Design a protein with these regions (language model features):
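Walker A (P-loop) phosphate-binding motif
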Residues: 3-29
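Conserved beta-strand segments of the P-loop GTPase G domain that flank and frequently precede/overlap
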Residues: 11, 34-35, 84-87, 104-109, ...
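Short beta-strand-centered segment that lines the nucleotide-binding/catalytic pocket of NTP-utilizing
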Residues: 29-45
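Switch II (G3) loop of P-loop NTPases
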Residues: 77-97
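Inter-motif core of Ras-like GTPase G domains
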Residues: 92-112
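Conserved C-terminal guanine-recognition region of P-loop GTPase G domains, centered on the G4
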Residues: 115-140
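Beta-strand-loop-alpha "switch" segments that mediate conformational coupling across diverse proteins
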Residues: 147-194
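NTP-binding/hydrolysis catalytic cores, primarily Walker-type P-loop NTPases
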Residues: 188-217
Length: 217
């Protein structure tokens, strides 16, 4: 019998860097991304193994795999690592409600709207899955200096408290050119490291990914 599968979903009704985080995580966990964003053909440009999930398929979760079905075919999705990552578009796919992910990662940029939407996303998830384990990520893509960073983290924490989400962990993802490069060069993070002597620059991202993994494993 297969090992139990761990399902991880990146979600936010607005943008917050969901796909970038999904990619970093998939690379580190050596697993596959299920892309639910119908506007993006991630299969085409993700180097990390990615499967686009068509709208017309139903999804059923078994202990060690997911089963995709339409009228004529059935497809089993199973990974060697036993981890599977669902990357959502800008809405919460109804099919994911029943799947009850083991972890939900909700990334947010630092602007008011993005933060509000990430809180709304968390409420929505908890309404359907009261035991949901949520990890908030404040994405510092637009934060340029330490003072702003400290202010923004404080602001974000205030939102967390007001919404009663203190029991969940919040991680900070530092600003990095890495995400852009991963797409432009169509490569993986670890392959990039050798190419540019920028280990130091990416150390913060490594640290972020390691912290994220510790919460999941």
């Amino acid at each position: 019998k297969g090992k139990q599968m761990v399902l991880i979903t990146t979600a936010n009704f607005r943008s917050g860097g969901k796909s970038s985080i999904a990619r970093l995580l998939a690379e580190k966990l050596n697993t596959t991304i299920l892309n639910f964003d119908k506007k993006r053909d991630s299969e085409a440009y993700n180097v990390v193994s990615t499967i686009n999930i068509p709208e017309n398929k139903s999804i059923e979760r078994k202990e060690d795999c997911l089963i995709l079905r339409d009228k004529t075919t059935e497809q089993t999705i199973k990974t060697k690592s036993n981890y599977l990552i669902c990357d959502l578009g800008g809405y919460f796919d109804e099919r994911l409600v029943d799947l009850k992910s083991d972890f939900y990662i909700i990334p947010s940029f630092d602007d008011y709207e993005s933060i509000s939407e990430s809180m709304r996303t968390a409420h929505y998830i908890l309404k359907n899955n009261i035991k949901a384990k949520i990890i908030f990520v404040l994405n510092g893509a637009f934060i340029v200096d330490k003072t702003t960073k400290d202010e923004k983290i404080k602001e974000f924490q205030e939102h967390i408290e007001v919404n009663g989400f203190n029991r969940f962990t919040t991680l900070f993802l530092p600003k990095t050119a890495l995400m852009r490069k991963l797409v432009d060069e169509n490569t993986k993070k670890d392959d990039l490291k050798g190419k540019f002597e920028q280990n130091i620059k990416y150390k913060n991202v490594d640290k972020f990914v390691d912290e994220l993994i510790k919460l999941i494993i």
